[in-house]
Amino acid sequence: IKDMKNNKFGVMDILNVFPDLSNDIATTSLDTVMDYIRERIEIPNVKTDIMILAGGGHEFFARESGIRYKKNTLFDDPNENIMVHIKTRIEDTRKYYTQISLDEIRKRVDEPAWWNATRAMCAFVLVVAEKIGAKYIIPTDISMIYGII
């Protein structure tokens, strides 16, 4: 670990300020939410091309949400088998806020309430990716119980 920051700030804090993010279609803009996060989060001052998401069902989210992804061609790992280019993730997150129906997703999944915080999570992902200069995001379903190397 080159640098680490612990934040006592998360998706539920975002939902308390912007409760519409859990509605079918959000009325608060992605830019507004990202600005709010930028003002409050501490992010390590490191740069990396690849950001791996773990500990929150990120691969499940990518596969069910309409976020476009492709096979991970950067490295071979069965637990990290899909990837998203940052430009695609930004475009698709904007659509996720303004065009993709959470109600439609909730109808087809086993845990509909889990989706309430996903727009807030997406904004966090983009703020961190922006700060570290990530070009690719690798969404995984790896549990944090395994630890981070």
Mark where each language-model region is.
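Helical "lid/coupling" subdomains associated with nucleotide-phosphate turnover
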Residues: 2-149
